[in-house]
């Protein structure tokens, strides 16, 4: 008799992504315009390819520091100093394997089991799975056509409960393409400050 190996309840609860199902369906129609995954419609720039090849030739093929190489973290901090805040240093920067790892680490750091994180609805479905896998809950906040599907501070305010710990913003939003305005962000920041909430951004 064949024995069935046990898997965790967490794995059983993890919601399946509809994106891959749609991806497979769209593959049956060559003329379809695929909006299933957030992948650029252009090739990797040559200077990035050249840098990757150069790194291989120079033997940069071993474990890097957990937070990323010092040079890269310093370069990111310099860019952010120009764009956002002059106080950024490499100590504010962690290099992750894509945005999803970064968001997952942030959720693990900021949320306890039973906590809530507010997400725009519709949103990238992995947000629900990531929150669920650490025992937290992603709470959908509806977005509306009249605001071009940009999540609004007033709707976030309505969704806040005593268990709310964070707001997750996605701009440009996957899947709606909505881009938050400066006014949107300032209004959301006010709600976050009022309720002492963290704000995570997936950009």
Model-derived regions, located:
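Short acidic capping loops at alpha-helix termini that bridge into adjacent secondary structure
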Residues: 87-93, 113-116, 163
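Helix C-cap/helix->beta junction micro-motif
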Residues: 29, 134, 194-195
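Conserved PLP-anchoring active-site segment centered on the Schiff-base-forming lysine
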Residues: 109-131
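Aromatic/hydrophobic pocket-lining residues that form π-stacking "cages" and hydrophobic walls in ligand
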Residues: 22, 127, 188
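Active-site phosphate-binding strand-loop segment of PLP-dependent enzymes
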Residues: 139, 144-203
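N-terminal small-domain helix-loop-helix segment of the aminotransferase-like
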Residues: 2, 9-98, 105
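A short helix-loop-beta submotif of the ANL/AMP-binding
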Residues: 132-139
């Amino acid at each position: 008799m064949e024995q069935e190996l046990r898997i965790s309840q967490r794995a059983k609860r993890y919601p399946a992504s509809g994106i891959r199902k749609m991806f497979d369906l769209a593959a049956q129609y060559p003329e379809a315009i695929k909006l299933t995954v957030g992948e650029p419609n252009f090739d990797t720039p040559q200077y990035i390819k050249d840098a990757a090849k150069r790194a291989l030739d120079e033997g940069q093929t071993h474990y890097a520091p957990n937070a990323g190489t010092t040079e890269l973290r310093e370069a990111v901090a310099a860019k952010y100093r120009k764009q956002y805040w002059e106080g950024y240093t490499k100590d504010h920067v962690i290099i992750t394997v894509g945005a999803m790892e970064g968001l997952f680490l942030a959720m693990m750091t900021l949320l306890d089991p039973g906590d809530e994180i507010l997400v725009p609805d519709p949103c990238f479905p992995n947000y629900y799975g990531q929150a669920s896998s650490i025992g937290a809950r992603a709470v959908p906040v509806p977005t509306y056509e009249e605001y071009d599907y940009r999540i609004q501070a007033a709707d976030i305010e309505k969704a806040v409960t005593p268990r709310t710990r964070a707001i997750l913003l996605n701009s440009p939003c996957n899947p709606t393409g909505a881009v938050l305005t400066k006014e949107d962000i300032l209004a959301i920041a006010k709600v976050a400050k009022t309720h002492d909430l963290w704000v995570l951004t997936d950009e």
